[in-house]
Amino acid sequence: MLRTHLAGSLRAEQAQQTVTLTGWVARRRDHGGVIFIDLRDASGVSQVVFREGAAAEQAHRLRAEYCVKVTGVVEVRPEGNQNFEIPTGAIEVNVTELEVLNESAPLPFQLDDQAGEEARLKYRYLDLRREGPGHAIRLRSKVNAAARAVLAHHEFVEVETPTLTRSTPEGARDFLVPARLQPGSFYALPQSPQLFKQLLMVGGIERYYQIARCYRDEDFRADRQPEFTQLDIEMSFVNQDDVILLAEEVLTSLWKLVGHEIKTPIARMTYAEAMRRYGSDKPDLRFGVELVECAEFFTDTTFRVFQQEYVGAVVMPGGASQPRKQLDAWQEWAKQRGAKGLAYVLVGEDGTLGGPVAKNLTDAERDGLAAHVGAKPGDCIFFAAGATKSSRALLGAARGEIARKQNLIDPDAWAFVWIVDAPLFEPTADATASGDVALGYSAWTAVHHAFTSPKPESIDTFDTDPGSALAYAYDIVCNGNEIGGGSIRIHRKDIQERVFKVMGISHEEAEEKFGFLLDAFAFGAPPHGGIAFGWDRITALLAGVDSIREVIAFPKSGGGVDPLTSAPAPITAQQRKESGVDAKPEPKGDAAAAKPQVSAEK
């Protein structure tokens, strides 16, 4: 090794020891001919001092981010010169030898300044030298190790599944890779290891896991990455409770890394209850504001806006004092989410109701409204009316905005909940409206994916009554973020074919795209289930950062572009020719037979 110690490891107990350190010049200060350098490596920072001799002469040429090697004696800093904000603040190294390992060009941004994200991503290798980004990547490694330790204890087998496979519809668009040796044919990068892990269960592996890279060619949304990581787990001969028990053990081990003990078992909530109370299937339970059903309260209303299948409300504590400008801003906020607006009533300090909606209510409605929704003097009541799903979603989003504006969220709190009993299917129109790629060609598509088993009570009726069928699925939510989702899978060929039929996937298409899975189910496939954790999101939560880009070594920008390498980029004409990307596949079946034949005779 070029060094004897790590810069961040030195303490007063090592005084008078001769040490060799390596790292980067973080800061340089000249004081009356004495040069002080903050020397940084992966472990932290130590102050090194150049007082005299050849090393001090050399030190005058040092600049920010020069890579250096120094040898010197550890000394206790004089009284009053200690820096108790860093672990090494009680000592300094009196340098006797200096070697410049490499110089640095002028920096595109100062590492101790707040740089723009575009610059940070373009020079990510510099960004990673900063304490925050470097810590996040090292934390991610510890997260991986902690999960592996739990799974190894339970004798899980880590298996790498293919990253070049065939295109199979899974709910998003595939990234396609041309197959040079078969012009006109393409591999697909996997959206998840879903089908292969199920085949591993058929193969008797029984307990599988993988820290898996996944790829989805989605329309770009905030804080999404085209390539991301899952901790993927699958188990044979299990039910929902078995998977949840293991998942909680994994989560407990991860949160211990940041000093938090998760209380288990984690509470469970049905999808229906979550939507009714919070307007979201991933509710943030760190604060107590809930939606209130009001349709029955307004049964006999003469106010046409509230003559709808659903009327709901959410209370903003202290919101009656908002200026008119802020109330108008709420209307624009709602319109950006596809609503016509956000009706409101202001509760005065004397209990009287104000605002445009209050004028349209009867005396009885005005008298009873505050008590019905739990509003107090000084509160604001927001309403949504119309289709149940969209109205609840609007109020759920408003609930989150209220919490942020009114500082209702404890930033140090962790609130976990399992969401169970979600619908098995949803109307295809709803899926496409929310930006998802609907699988199949019927009026119904899968909420999770096509391989999720119906709950036992829905097995006999899910194809005759798709709208009422429940999925044997479970999602884990932390602080309003879905950090994992799983299900008990279909393991019988007849049930899988019935699910495909509900989704409008023909027998022929099912055989073409999923025939290998259906064939496997015919050979004694065991009952099985699993879960996939969103590894980037979990690590971001543990690191205390807002964006998953902070915990990915080399992330893409919000537009899916890599500023560091300028990917994606055009290919050359030669690459295009060699890859066969423009080749047309040979026709099959009847089309091939109908193709005119060219005689070989001259």
Curated annotation (Swiss-Prot):
What Enzyme Commission number(s) apply to this enzyme? 6.1.1.23
Q: Which PROSITE patterns match?
A: AA_TRNA_LIGASE_II
Q: What is this protein called?
A: Aspartate--tRNA(Asp/Asn) ligase
| Important for tRNA non-discrimination, annotated site positions | H31, G80
Question: Encoded by which gene?
Answer: aspS
Q: Where in the cell is it found?
A: Cytoplasm
The enzyme's main class, written as a single word, is ligase
For this chain, the family text in UniProt reads:
Belongs to the class-II aminoacyl-tRNA synthetase family. Type 1 subfamily.
